[in-house]
């Protein structure tokens, strides 16, 4: 498979400026008590997501007197966990695309990651958070992660494609299934000003592509990583490799 120059990490290791160290880079919120939706039979206005997730997934920036950019909600879903996901998405009115492309997208479409722009009051969005015995009650499948972004699906897709494959400390390519919440959270938890490599998952100093990421852990809690900002003076690390801390986190 041919690798495009902009497909993989080229700007991973950074050193933050000193004054930036006084500001929080990432805010981490653990959302406890998230209860999945039930069938909501007889409910006039059924909920789209659990109450606890309404603001994290569909809330908008506070009105500061200026026109704030709208935050969109994206899910990156594992087709191996949802039977017939490509066909299911084709029958929705939601924007979506496969993170793989070319031959890989065709041959692996039923096991590939798919990005979909979620909308409120949408049946598919609701299904992701509904627990039940039906074939489209998808809560128990825990199929992916959720992102908030001010950018289009095409922009977010192009950015996330860079992270399907990473280099370890020996320069070897590794597949990174970041659409599985537990390994992604382990990776994002390694952010620090000493080793802020995973800030690149959110974007660059010039362009913040991902404002927040929500993942679900083994205990059923949701964890929200919110990127406040990316330092505007960063030094590139030409090696573009995972730090030892990140390797240990992903191996756990």
Residue spans of the language-model regions?
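Terminal low-complexity "docking" segments
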Residues: 1-177, 181-252
